[in-house]
Amino acid sequence: MKGFYRLLFILTLLFQFNGNAQITPSPIKNSKVIVIYGSPDCHYCIDLKKTLVDQNKNFVFYDIDTNKVALNEMLTKLSRAKISTTNLQIPVVDKYGVMYVNSANFKDFVEKIVE
């Protein structure tokens, strides 16, 4: 029985450290990288990513549905920028330290990101 508990303890430690490594957003070394917070099923997120690829822009996408660390990072950045999270629409973009949220006019939002 002691062996079972030792094995359970070791497996718990292994999965705990592996799980944390997978969900932590890596720091962006290059300040010329656009960070997108969104959902892989969001049509606005899909359209924005396609536009950035077409425009040859560097970006990183974080799925805030599954990555709670990225979600908290996004909320912290919005709070620091004094942007309300009430009725927030995705995608949310950090473009070189300036935060942008999806507005009523998606075309204008995308133009701000790609310019």
Language-model features: locations:
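Thiol-based oxidoreductase modules, predominantly thioredoxin-like and allied folds used
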Residues: 58-75
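Boundary at the C-terminal end of the N-terminal hydrophobic targeting segment
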Residues: 19-21
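Solvent-exposed, polar/charged alpha-helical surfaces in well-ordered, non-transmembrane soluble domains
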Residues: 46, 50-53, 72, 76, ...
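Bacterial N-terminal signal peptides that target proteins for export
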Residues: 1-7
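Non-catalytic, surface beta->alpha helical segment in thiol-disulfide oxidoreductase systems
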Residues: 94-115
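Local sequence-structure signature of Cys/Sec-based thiol-disulfide redox active-site neighborhoods
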Residues: 24-60
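Bacterial N-terminal signal peptides
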Residues: 7-16
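Structural micro-motif
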Residues: 81-94
